[in-house]
Amino acid sequence: MAGTGIIAIAAAIAAFTGIGAGIGISLATGKAVEGIARQPEAAGSIRTSLLLGAALAEATAIYGLVVALVLVFLKM
């Protein structure tokens, strides 16, 4: 039974990757909006870089969620 508590804590820590991804994506979006406001002609390039970065940041959140679900439901 002691292992169940440790698994719950590990799953909670893994689920917190969503917070980091959210903060990272919001900071990147803010800087992209600033960049587009300063140089509207570079909007396409900035938007492409933003989408690539946001996808990579969101992938870490998805991996964290998968790890948390595996820990909770499979009780490794």
Swiss-Prot record:
Supply the alphabetized keyword list. Answer: ATP synthesis, Cell membrane, CF(0), Hydrogen ion transport, Ion transport, Lipid-binding, Membrane, Transmembrane, Transmembrane helix, Transport
State whether keyword Transmembrane helix applies.
yes
Described purpose of this protein according to its UniProt entry: F(1)F(0) ATP synthase produces ATP from ADP in the presence of a proton or sodium gradient. F-type ATPases consist of two structural domains, F(1) containing the extramembraneous catalytic core and F(0) containing the membrane proton channel, linked together by a central stalk and a peripheral stalk. During catalysis, ATP synthesis in the catalytic domain of F(1) is coupled via a rotary mechanism of the central stalk subunits to proton translocation. Key component of the F(0) channel; it plays a direct role in translocation across the membrane. A homomeric c-ring of between 10-14 subunits forms the central stalk rotor element with the F(1) delta and epsilon subunits.
Principal localization? membrane
TM regions (residue ranges): 5-25, 54-74
- Where is this protein localized, as stated in its record? Cell membrane
Q: Which Gene3D superfamilies match?
A: F1F0 ATP synthase subunit C
Q: Which family does it belong to?
A: Belongs to the ATPase C chain family.
What Pfam families does the annotation carry? ATP-synt_C
State what protein this is by name. ATP synthase subunit c
The gene it comes from is atpE
Family annotation (InterPro entries): ATP_synth_csu_bac/chlpt, ATP_synth_F0_csu, ATP_synth_F0_csu_DDCD_BS, ATP_synth_F0_csu_sf, ATPase_proteolipid_c-like_dom, F/V-ATP_Csub_sf
Molecular function terms from GO: lipid binding; proton-transporting ATP synthase activity, rotational mechanism
Q: How does it sit in the membrane?
A: Multi-pass membrane protein
This entry carries the following GO cellular component terms, namely: plasma membrane; proton-transporting ATP synthase complex; proton-transporting two-sector ATPase complex, proton-transporting domain
- Annotated site residue numbers, Reversibly protonated during proton transport: E58
Subunit structure, as described in the record: F-type ATPases have 2 components, F(1) - the catalytic core - and F(0) - the membrane proton channel. F(1) has five subunits: alpha(3), beta(3), gamma(1), delta(1), epsilon(1). F(0) has three main subunits: a(1), b(2) and c(10-14). The alpha and beta chains form an alternating ring which encloses part of the gamma chain. F(1) is attached to F(0) by a central stalk formed by the gamma and epsilon chains, while a peripheral stalk is formed by the delta and b chains.
Alphabetical list of SUPFAM superfamilies matching this protein: F1F0 ATP synthase subunit C
